[in-house]
Structure formats: structure tokens, C-alpha cells
């Protein structure tokens, strides 16, 4: 079976395969153009007659559980990433698969991190055929150099849920690391020595997988309250000595930036939102965990405090600064998909106004609405943007695949999307004629904030009108690009072969772009 076949040009002008790892794929048609048909996928029917009447599903060890689950060649094995770089379970699963001589597995993580670098040896020896999920760091380099046997597929968090729900991906065995569980399999992420916050990224896995194994290091008597994963979905429970390192769930800097340029980006972004009337009593916002985004949140807090306003809700990932806004009464609710530090974990556990969400509620595009389009202001990053406001978040200027999509694509449906980004990194301009990899169509990106000026998407005539009298340096994106090239020169394009090594899916499951092998 070839990795891919039947290349076509999609609605974004990108050449993409329509056969991927032996399965038919649909090319991107435009925003909201592809409408799904049919019904949701479903797991196998089960019978209580096959489970212990006392509810005790505990199995002696992870190897025994995988064997009992029927692990075999060619299966799809899923894991979640709520422990981020502190995950101790994912690699163990494939250590066991290798020991058992299993080959051709598809790994379906909700994300990968540097702690998963050991997976490269299993990609090399055929234990893992390919990854459908983020391919960060060493895994991204391995993929970019054309070494992965199958074709990689990158999806957003919402796109992952959509793919499972729609039957595009069938999970054979889901391994769900849970900081606290009872013997029945009810589990949560807010209690126990490895508490990580929510477990929402594992929701689709629990709901749709043929076999679900919960792995915990904190087994409590029934019932485990609150439960984020319902034990009625769970086949087996395994107890290990340690499943995660909570200190390593920390994402980004989790500290406000001290860089003068980044502070300027934050200040201008907040000032833009204020002058454009985007901040009001009862508004909502979402920002990331990087230093610039955290600083923007602090500027928002100052504005709210001064005017005695409140944000109705903020979308997480949560962090100590967002938690402080909640506790101060500047934010009424945090709707949180993942916690970026231990203050977020504590708050989710103790504060009923800090509630966990999942990709189903927040991001699933094949549903009856989701939360993402209700957010007033969305602050995001990007590795590149182009003169048409298209953006890239997965590859760098050298063409290497180094990041996952996360919830980035899904949040583009917010009412105003702002990208505060440096005009250049390591003397390489960030604004290009065309992004290396298309991850977000420009029609959904409204404002680019750089340390040399702010560009408003011409589609947003309302924002252009509101900012006519602003003292902020409002410029065109072409002017910003020209200034970057005057300082740094015109950047060279990365050198690629014609071979496709991975694809980027859009939120509706269509193929948005191809990632090609880097010529070393």
C-alpha cells in the first residue's frame, strides 16, 4: 500500500492527495462548504454479563491489559497528552507492543511532546507504521526527512474528535492515563499525585474505542468523584507506580514576557482591542500560555479593573494569571480544555466556576454548534503568515515539521482573531508571499500585530473604520513585509522534494495542505 495517491488541487490552491494510507480523503472545499452525511460511528455493543458484578475491573499490569484487549498487528492505539511533557504512559504502551513483536500500529495521540522521542525507534523498526497527531521535535524531524513508513496526518483538537466521531479513525485500543480512578473506571484529572486538570482530550477515545484501558497511580474506592471519564466506557483499569510528572505539564513560558519587543506586542494588542470596542462588560476571550499572550491577559485585567467590568468567560488553557483574574472577580467563568500549570489544576479542582471542557463542546465542527464561535477575542501565535493573512503553525522557515495544530484552527472561528507575532525571528522575516504550510485560511484571521506595526485584514472594514483615528501604527501587511525584507533580506524558500510525508486536515476533515520531504 502506498502512502498516498491521486494528487489534486484543492480550493485553497494547494496540491493534496485524495488517497491517504489506503483511505479516500476529501480535498478542502472552502470554509463551511463540505457538509457531512450519514451517522456517527459507534463502539461495539457490550454486555454486563462480561464484566465483574462488583465493578472491579482492575487488571494486574499494563502488559496483561494490552494482551487481554487483543493487541495485534495493524491496530490503532490512542493516548492523550494532558501530562504534556510529563507523560510516563504513552511510551510504555509501545515498549510493550515492541516486546510482544507487534508491527504496523498506528499511534493516535491527541498530541506528542519531547518525552515521546523514544517513539522514533519504534517508527524505525516498524512497531509503529505512522502517526496521526502532532509530530513535534524529533518526531517531526523524522517525518520531515521522509523516514516514516505511512503518511502523517495532522489534525486540530476538534478535528481529532470529528475524525473519531465520523468514523474516519477507528480506535482499537484507547489507553487513558488518569490521575485518579476507581476500580470501575470512573476517573478524573484533578485529584491524585499526578493531577493534570481535565481529561477532555481523551473523551472521544473513551466514547468510541473498541477497548478502553484506564491507567492510574491513584486508585480510590468507588465512586471517584468527580468523574470526567465515565467508567461505563471502560474495559480495564491498571494501577502503576507513577503515570505522570505534574511539574512537567507546564506549557510555554507560563511567565509574562520580559522582552521589550514582546511586551510592546502585548500592549499594542490590548490597546487595539480596547480602541476597537472589542473589550466590554461581559466580553469573552481566549489566549495561549506563551509570554506574550500572558502579558496581553494582564493588560486586559488592568482595563477591566479600572472600569469595574467583568469578562463573562475566558477559554483556557488556564494558567496562574487567568486563575488570578477568576479569583479577583474579573472573569466570571473559565471554560478550560487543558491546564498549563499547577495553579490551573488547583483552581479546576476547587472552584466550581472553573469548569473542564472537551473538544466535543468547544471545537467539534461536525456538531450542532460549538463554543469557539462565541468567543469575542482570540489571541494566537504563528510561525509564518503571508500577505493574504494565511497562517502556518506546524512548520518553520526551514520546512521542518516541528509543531502540532492543537486547538489553533478551531479558535479561528472566534469573532476577532489577533496574531501578535514578531516581524522576524533569527533575522528571518515571518511575513511571506506564501506560507510554507497552510494551516489557517486568511479569511478567518483579522489582525496581525508586530513590533513595527499592525495590519488589519481588508475584509474587516468595521475594524479599519474604528481604528482610523488611532495613534497605533496601522499599516498594510505588504508594508510590514517590505520593512522586514529591507532589514533582513528576502528569505530563501526551504528545499523540498515532491514526496508528501504528511498532510494537514482542516476542521471538517478535508485535506488543507501537504507537507513535503525536506531535502537535507
Model-identified regions with their sequence ranges:
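Conserved alpha/beta enzyme-core scaffold
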Residues: 2-520
Amino acid at each position: 500500500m502506498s502512502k498516498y495517491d491521486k494528487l489534486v488541487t484543492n480550493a485553497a490552491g494547494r496540491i493534496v492527495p485524495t488517497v491517504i494510507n489506503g483511505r479516500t480523503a476529501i480535498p478542502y472545499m472552502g470554509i463551511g462548504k463540505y457538509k457531512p452525511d450519514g451517522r456517527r460511528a459507534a463502539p461495539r455493543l457490550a454486555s454486563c454479563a462480561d464484566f465483574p458484578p462488583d465493578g472491579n475491573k482492575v487488571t494486574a499490569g499494563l502488559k496483561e491489559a494490552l494482551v487481554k484487549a487483543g493487541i495485534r498487528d495493524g491496530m490503532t492505539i490512542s493516548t492523550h497528552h494532558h501530562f504534556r511533557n510529563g507523560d510516563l504512559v504513552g511510551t510504555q504502551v509501545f515498549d510493550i507492543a515492541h516486546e510482544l513483536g507487534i508491527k504496523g500500529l498506528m499511534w493516535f495521540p491527541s498530541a506528542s511532546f519531547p518525552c515521546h522521542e523514544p517513539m522514533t525507534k519504534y517508527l524505525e523498526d516498524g512497531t509503529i507504521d505512522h502517526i496521526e497527531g502532532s509530530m513535534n521535535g524529533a518526531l517531526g524531524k523524522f517525518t520531515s526527512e521522509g523516514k516514516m513508513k505511512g503518511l502523517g496526518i495532522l489534525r486540530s483538537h476538534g478535528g481529532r474528535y470529528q475524525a473519531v466521531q465520523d468514523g474516519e479513525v477507528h480506535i482499537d485500543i484507547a489507553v487513558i492515563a488518569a490521575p485518579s480512578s476507581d476500580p470501575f473506571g470512573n476517573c478524573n484529572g484533578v485529584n491524585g499525585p499526578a493531577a493534570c486538570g481535565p481529561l477532555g482530550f481523551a473523551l472521544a477515545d473513551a466514547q468510541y474505542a473498541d477497548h478502553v484501558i484506564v491507567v492510574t497511580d491513584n486508585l480510590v474506592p468507588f465512586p471517584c468523584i468527580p468523574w470526567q471519564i465515565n467508567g461505563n466506557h471502560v474495559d480495564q483499569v491498571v494501577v502503576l507506580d507513577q503515570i505522570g510528572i505534574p511539574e512537567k505539564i507546564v506549557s510555554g513560558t507560563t511567565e509574562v514576557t520580559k522582552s521589550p519587543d514582546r511586551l510592546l506586542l502585548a500592549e499594542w494588542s490590548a490597546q487595539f482591542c480596547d480602541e476597537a470596542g472589542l473589550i466590554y462588560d461581559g466580553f469573552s476571550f481566549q489566549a495561549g500560555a506563551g509570554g506574550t499572550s500572558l502579558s496581553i491577559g494582564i493588560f486586559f485585567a488592568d482595563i477591566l479593573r479600572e472600569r469595574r467590568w467583568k469578562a463573562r468567560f475566558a477559554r483556557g488553557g488556564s494558567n496562574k494569571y487567568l486563575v488570578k483574574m477568576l479569583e479577583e472577580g474579573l472573569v466570571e467563568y473559565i471554560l478550560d480544555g487543558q491546564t498549563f500549570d499547577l495553579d490551573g489544576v488547583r483552581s479546576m479542582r476547587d472552584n466550581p466556576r472553573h469548569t473542564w471542557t472537551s473538544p466535543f463542546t468547544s471545537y467539534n465542527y461536525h456538531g450542532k454548534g460549538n463554543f469557539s464561535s462565541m468567543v469575542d477575542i482570540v489571541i494566537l501565535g504563528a510561525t509564518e503568515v503571508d500577505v493574504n493573512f494565511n497562517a502556518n503553525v506546524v512548520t518553520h522557515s526551514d520546512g521542518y515539521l516541528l509543531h502540532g495544530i492543537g486547538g489553533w484552527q478551531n479558535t479561528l472561528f472566534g469573532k476577532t482573531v489577533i496574531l501578535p507575532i514578531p516581524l522576524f525571528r533569527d533575522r528571518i522575516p515571518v511575513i511571506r508571499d506564501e506560507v510554507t504550510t497552510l494551516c489557517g485560511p486568511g479569511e478567518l484571521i483579522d489582525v496581525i500585530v508586530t513590533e513595527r506595526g499592525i495590519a488589519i485584514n481588508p475584509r474587516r472594514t468595521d475594524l479599519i473604520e474604528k481604528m482610523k483615528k488611532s495613534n497605533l501604527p496601522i499599516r498594510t501587511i505588504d508594508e510590514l513585509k517590505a520593512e522586514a525584507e529591507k532589514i533582513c533580506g528576502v528569505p530563501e524558500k526551504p528545499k523540498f522534494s515532491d514526496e508528501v510525508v504528511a498532510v494537514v486536515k482542516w476542521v471538517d476533515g478535508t485535506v488543507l495542505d501537504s507537507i513535503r520531504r525536506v531535502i537535507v
